[in-house]
Structure formats: C-alpha cells, structure tokens
A protein has these predicted regions:
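Short hydrophobic/aromatic-rich motifs at helix boundaries and adjacent loops
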Residues: 25-26, 36-37, 52-53, 76-79, ...
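A general structural signal for short secondary-structure boundary/capping elements
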Residues: 87-91, 99-103, 117
Length: 123
C-alpha cells in the first residue's frame, strides 16, 4: 500500500491513500487439445511440485492457487501454473481475484488415451 503526503504548508502535512482500482483480470490462454504435445506434457510433469499439483487436482473438481501452493512463494507457484497451462494440463479461470484451477483430464484422455491415468497411478 502506498501512502502519499500532501504539503499544504510547511507545518501541515496530510496523508492520504489513493483510491483502489482493480482492473478486470485477463482471461488465461489455453492450448486447444490438438496443440498439446507429448514433449510439453512430460516436461510439465517432470517437476515434483507440478506433479503434486496435478495429483491434487485429480482428486477434486477445482482448487484455487492458494489451496495448492504448499507454502511456496507466489512467484514460484505462478511459474508452475503457467507451465501446466501451457502444456495443456490445467485450465485456469478467474473468479473475482482468485484463480481457480481444474485438470483437463477429458481433453488429455482424448489426445493421449490412458496416459494421465498411468502417470498418476505410478506417482
């Protein structure tokens, strides 16, 4: 939070907080199922943190980034979610100021039948 000082004279200092304005969040870009490649998918799942995120999402319909962060820094988790989105594993949508994530299991099963289930069974 930034606080600004106004000087109306040398002895009088007034502090004020500027009005808060939150612009609407941009929608995330997700690859179409036919653009999902096996290389990107396997790369995204090669990191233990991302694999744990996918494992958690497999057990629920949807979860926020905060529910999945495991106490890790926000910037680190933002990177992991971007890699998962770019690989086509996760769909992220905005709900107010929260990002809700869901596993794109149906899309992945159409593109690579049984792959996600096999990976999660072994993890």
């Amino acid at each position: 939070m930034r606080v600004f000082r106004l000087f109306d004279s040398i002895r009088n200092i007034a502090f004020f907080e500027p009005p808060r304005y939150h612009a609407p969040m941009r929608a995330f870009k997700h690859p179409i199922p036919s653009d999902v490649t096996l290389e990107r998918l396997l790369y995204a799942l090669s990191d233990p943190v991302r694999l744990e995120i996918v494992r958690c999402l497999a057990g629920v319909e949807e979860a926020s980034c905060g529910e999945l962060d495991g106490g890790r820094p926000k910037s680190t988790m933002s990177h992991h979610f971007r890699v998962l989105r770019d690989a086509g594993l996760v769909h992220t949508r905005n709900v107010g100021t929260t990002h809700m994530n869901s596993l794109r299991a149906e899309d992945l099963d159409q593109r690579f039948p049984g792959l996600l289930h096999s990976i999660l069974a072994q993890a």
